[in-house]
Amino acid sequence: MNRSRSESLFQKAQSLIVGGVNSPSRSFKAVGGGAPVFMEKAKGAYFWDVDGNQYIDYLAAYGPIITGHAHPHITNAIQRAAENGVLYGTPTKLENQFASMLQQAIPSLEKVRFVNSGTEAVMTTIRVARAYTGRDKIIKFAGCYHGHSDLVLVAAGSGPSTLGTPDSAGVTKNIAEEVITVPFNQLDSLKEALDHWGEEVAAVLVEPIVGNFGIVEPHEGFLEGVNELAHNAGALVIYDEVITAFRFMYEGAQNYVGVEPDMTALGKIIGGGLPIGAYGGRIDIMEKVAPLGPAYQAGTMAGNPASMSAGIACLEVLQEEGLYDELDRKGAILEKGIKAHAEAHGITISINRLKGALTVYFTDETVTCYEQAERSDGEKFSLFFKEMLNQGINLAPSKYEAWFLTIAHTDEDIEKTLQAVDHAFSVMAAKGYHLKR
C-alpha cells in the first residue's frame, strides 16, 4: 500500500509541530516508528488517506465515534449550530436540554457542569472532592489514564502504601506525593492504602470498566468494595467514564455494573465528535462549585452551542432500539473470528471484549490488571498492527488500546477485517512468532 504523501506530510509536520503530531498517541513510536497515516476524510466505518487508500476504522478517534463518522443527524445539528453562531459566552437552552438528557441516562448526576475535555472533567472532580472533604490526597489505579493534568500523571510507587512518583517531566514531586496508586481489581491493596493514608484521602478515582490498558471488567464485588472502603475512610468515589459512558449501553458503565459513585467525569462519546467534557454528582458535593461554592472552575468554550448540539444529536441516535444489542452481536463475531484465526496459525492471544469494544493481547493470560497487560508482547503487536494497516484496517498504534465497533460497521466489514487478521497471523507464523509464547 503506497503512503508516500503521508510520509511527505509527516516529514513537513515534524518541522512545524512537536513530534509531527498533536497528541503522542497518534505517533507510531509504540509500533516501531515510521510515518503515521494522514487521513483526508471519513464516512461511516471508513477512512480515506491522503494517498487515496481506504481503511475500515476501529480507532473511532479513540472511542468517541460510536455512531460512525459523519453521521447525518449529527452533522446536520452541527451545521445548524454553525449558522446560528458557535460561541456566545452566555447560557443557552441547549445546555439545559443536554444536561437533562445526561441526568435521565445517569441518575447519579444530580447536578452537572460542562467543560471542554475529559481531562478537564477529571481534573475538576478531584478539585471539588478536595474542596468537599478538606483533604488533599487521591488514590488511583495502576494503568488507568485520566487525562494529562499534573495530578493524574503519576506512576505507582513500590507498593500500595507508598506515594506516587512523577510519570511526566514537569510534574513536581510534591504533586506526585498527593497520589497513591494501587492495582486494579485488588481490594486488599486498596484497603492497605486506605488503612495507611485514609484520613488524608479526598477521593478514590477509578474507571468502572477499564478502557486504557484494554477493556478490563471489574471482578465481582470490586466496585462495591471500592465504595465501602472509600466511604468508611471518609473519602469520595469518582468514576472516570470518559470512555465508558454510552459505550456499552444507553447509560453509564455505572448503570451496567449497578454501583453508583459520588461524582462522575464524562467526555468522548457525549460530544458527538466535537470537544466536550462534563462532570456531575451529588447535589451537596456539586454545590461546592463556583458560583455557589469555593471550588473554582470556568471555561470560555464550556457549554458552547456547537458541542451541545452535537452531543444532543449523538444521544438521540444512540436511543435507537436494539442498537447496543447489534454492537454486541458484531463484537461477538469479530472476537470469535480473531480467536479462530489465531488458533489456526498457532498465535497465542487473549481477548477481552464487552459489547462492541475489545482488546487483543498477545499473551496467554486473561488480563485483569495493568501488570498483566504490560506482559502482552509489544513486538508481536507491532507486526500485527502493520500487517493490518497494510490490509486496510485502521487500529490504534498501541498494544494497550481497544478496537471500537461503531453502528456503521457491517457484517461485510467484519468479514473483510477477519480476512486481514488471517493474513496478519499467517505472516507472523511465517516469521516464527507462533513459536514464541
UniProtKB/Swiss-Prot annotation:
Its EC number is 5.4.3.8. Pfam families: Aminotran_3 (PF00202). InterPro entries: 4pyrrol_synth_GluAld_NH2Trfase, Aminotrans_3, Aminotrans_3_PPA_site, PyrdxlP-dep_Trfase, PyrdxlP-dep_Trfase_major, PyrdxlP-dep_Trfase_small. It catalyses: (S)-4-amino-5-oxopentanoate = 5-aminolevulinate. PROSITE patterns: AA_TRANSFER_CLASS_3. Pathway: Porphyrin-containing compound metabolism; protoporphyrin-IX biosynthesis; 5-aminolevulinate from L-glutamyl-tRNA(Glu): step 2/2. GO terms for molecular function: glutamate-1-semialdehyde 2,1-aminomutase activity; pyridoxal phosphate binding; transaminase activity. One of its GO terms (biological process) is protoporphyrinogen IX biosynthetic process. Homodimer. Belongs to the class-III pyridoxal-phosphate-dependent aminotransferase family. HemL subfamily. PANTHER family: GLUTAMATE-1-SEMIALDEHYDE 2,1-AMINOMUTASE (PTHR43713), GLUTAMATE-1-SEMIALDEHYDE 2,1-AMINOMUTASE 2 (PTHR43713:SF1). This is Glutamate-1-semialdehyde 2,1-aminomutase 1. It comes from Halalkalibacterium halodurans (strain ATCC BAA-125 / DSM 18197 / FERM 7344 / JCM 9153 / C-125) (Bacillus halodurans). The lineage of its organism: Bacteria, Bacillati, Bacillota, Bacilli, Bacillales. The gene is hemL1.
